[in-house]
Amino acid sequence: MLRPVETPTREIKKLDGLWAFSLDRENCGIDQRWWESALQESRAIAVPGSFNDQFADADIRNYAGNVWYQREVFIPKGWAGQRIVLRFDAVTHYGKVWVNNQEVMEHQGGYTPFEADVTPYVIAGKSVRITVCVNNELNWQTIPPGMVITDENGKKKQSYFHDFFNYAGIHRSVMLYTTPNTWVDDITVVTHVAQDCNHASVDWQVVANGDVSVELRDADQQVVATGQGTSGTLQVVNPHLWQPGEGYLYELCVTAKSQTECDIYPLRVGIRSVAVKGEQFLINHKPFYFTGFGRHEDADLRGKGFDNVLMVHDHALMDWIGANSYRTSHYPYAEEMLDWADEHGIVVIDETAAVGFNLSLGIGFEAGNKPKELYSEEAVNGETQQAHLQAIKELIARDKNHPSVVMWSIANEPDTRPQGAREYFAPLAEATRKLDPTRPITCVNVMFCDAHTDTISDLFDVLCLNRYYGWYVQSGDLETAEKVLEKELLAWQEKLHQPIIITEYGVDTLAGLHSMYTDMWSEEYQCAWLDMYHRVFDRVSAVVGEQVWNFADFATSQGILRVGGNKKGIFTRDRKPKSAAFLLQKRWTGMNFGEKPQQGGKQ
């Protein structure tokens, strides 16, 4: 799915700003056809943004069910005769949309875009009413899963099995955009780089309802190569490669023409190669070592609402600390984030929202509502698998052309020990490879699924591990934790002979808490714990990356294990550094960029 851009043939009207907002406490909005008139008892709400924290009302913050958004929109007079499309970049977790009284689309899945051609339902030079019913409920057949229960007071309550707050609403931009009636509908680009990096090729495939031509232009807008037709290959001599740390981008200018119209779409292209060879992860045929974070789209007041200021500041902090990569834990991030990564040479592991496929973590289950078996008709079943496949399809369709995206992660921390795990994940791994044969794939492994009990890791190209020795187990005992961690990593290395990326490692740390004795929760313990992990990483040859959990403290559901959210951040939720930020900055900026440190750290 192409991201809307303004060109000589296309225009965009952003609908971000204040909308009318109403809770549907009685779940009567559909029956009463709320889209047919102005919302009653509404209040103003900011879009984009989660609805949960915009008001001083705990009932709204923890609300489960339907909410409604509405606003009047003027259609520019100059849009007459154009194709007009309404697009939502993300509605969490389900959205149904009306233009005036006409239902135009619905979408399940909270982190990927959806759109509809609304040309038949609008008139240029007049206003229309746009109404959206948003539902934030999760069940075992949604991605991510959850359960809706009713408490003793008859109030619905959303439980979920992932450790971050279930923010909901219209989280990203809403827009109208135009195209001519002859238009470019989709583009797929795949780049190949010769072993000596002195030659590259760019394969293109275009979906359009007109005659197609393409021009590849360099960053100075000089034409490098041209082609005709809906598919083909362009040759590039002495290409300027997209590299980690240097986001050089070409532009593939695609034109679709009919006898009376033409459409122009410029797609930014990074020429680079990605491959796994033995225990190495290769970018442009060179071994690459990941440094960085698992992150969250999470901020005070905004929740998961996209914010440009936060994006700029977070990337400034990542640049300062020496991070060269991150994972979109645990859902696809805003497209603006990937554009930034493309431009700045940041390497991204792109993940679906499949998190919480686990009965063993103790998250989200009330007494008596825990299924007996994870992979079963009452929990993760065939319908779940189809929803999961759809999430993979939408992720790849949106992000396939981003050079920063070097690997797909199809799930985070599923329990892969029980019967049924391999039967569930094997078809999804196969489907992901068919959808994109050009990138490695992974499924992030949870701590208790070790080399002896896991049943699926051989289905993937890279082993991504989340490990917390010295925190959840061997608590406070760094000497024992170091031995156990190294023993497990060596067991995986011997079993799979794959690259290993530690996609999560971290400890909860209260900013300002200090200890002469390196006690847990103190800033001193966070530093000592990270130092220990780094010694192990440097000794295990298959480890090709370290992504700390987490970049910043983030909101979670209430519970006795979480005091004001998850505190594993290297930065606080308002982006103040803890002591460990300076430890990481010294380690990561002291490395040769993208290269693994020399082995050392003898015990």
Swiss-Prot record:
GO terms for cellular component: cytosol; protein-containing complex. InterPro entries: Beta-gal/glucu_dom_sf, Galactose-bd-like_sf, Glyco_hydro_2, Glyco_hydro_2_AS, Glyco_hydro_2_cat, Glyco_hydro_2_CS, Glyco_hydro_2_Ig-like, Glyco_hydro_2_N. The active site is at E413, E504. GO terms for biological process: carbohydrate metabolic process; glucuronoside catabolic process. GO terms for molecular function: beta-glucuronidase activity; carbohydrate binding; identical protein binding. Its EC number is 3.2.1.31. Potently inhibited by a set of synthetic compounds like thio-urea derivatives and analogs, and uronic isofagomine (UIFG) derivatives. Inhibitors of gut microbial beta-glucuronidases block the reactivation of glucuronidated cancer drugs, and thereby alleviate drug-induced GI toxicity. It holds the Pfam family Glyco_hydro_2. Optimum pH is 5.0-7.5. Coiled coil: none annotated. Keywords: Glycosidase, Hydrolase. A motif (N-K motif) lies at residues 566-568. D-glucuronate binds at D163, N412, N466, Y472, E504, W549, K568. Displays beta-glucuronidase activity with the artificial substrate p-nitrophenyl-beta-D-glucuronide (PNPG) and with 4-methylumbelliferyl-glucuronide. Is likely capable of scavenging glucuronate from a range of chemically distinct xenobiotic and endobiotic glucuronides present in the gastrointestinal (GI) tract, to be able to utilize these diverse sources of carbon. As part of the GI microbiome, this enzyme is able to reactivate glucuronide drug conjugates, such reactivated compounds can significantly damage the GI tract. Homotetramer. Belongs to the glycosyl hydrolase 2 family. The N-K motif seems to be a discriminant that could be employed as a fingerprint to identify beta-glucuronidases from the large GH2 family of proteins. NCBIfam families: PRK10150.1. This is Beta-glucuronidase.
